[in-house]
Amino acid sequence: MKKLLALAMLLVLCTVLTGLLTGCKVSAANTMMVDDTPKVTVTSPDVPVISTEWTERQYTVSEQDETVLLTARYQIPVLTLTGSPDNSDTAAKNRQAAVQRINDWFTDWRDQQVDMLDEMEQMAREEYKITGGERWKTEDFAYRDEAGISWWQNERLLCVTLSYVSYTGGAHPSTWRQAVSFDLSTG
């Protein structure tokens, strides 16, 4: 319960800081998710636009009898720099380096999630063996690990909320969120 309260307080703090850092004004370039699709509106030619494509990786682990033991799905953004008001080589290189650092962070994060799948797979196989697969005969029963993303962006910041759902055979799945903010000029 203390961890949940601490996470909630962190999310509120990130939200307040984001509002303060953006000066509580309408940004020149706003990006939001609309119907699970990123929408970008640029209202000033002086703002470089960083566009985002989504990549999703899915994993499935099955028993020899084709019973699905574990499914995993991880969604991460892949940022690309699509415009630049300043064509100097140094500024363009700095922005590109920032975008690369952000992309590397998300790739590393996803790889850490995938690394934990080995442990989940071992747990699922052990339970399957112990129970004779009885629980897996229930419709849609399988261990599950998923992470999706919602985000907000202006000309200076990219704020991301990672939403996790993990199920390992208990009464209900575990859910939690992690908020991360990136400075678009430094990554």
Give the ranges of each region predicted by the language model.
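Short helix-loop boundary/capping segments
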Residues: 177-187
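Short, surface-exposed coil-to-beta transition loops
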Residues: 144-146, 164, 173-178
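Generic short beta-strand segments
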Residues: 161-167
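Bacterial signal peptide processing site
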Residues: 25-27
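C-terminal motif of bacterial Sec signal peptides marking the signal peptidase cleavage site
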Residues: 19-23
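Positively charged n-region of N-terminal signal peptides that target proteins for export
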Residues: 1-6
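Active-site acidic/histidine clusters and adjacent loop/turn architecture
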Residues: 40-156
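Sec-dependent N-terminal signal peptides
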Residues: 7-13
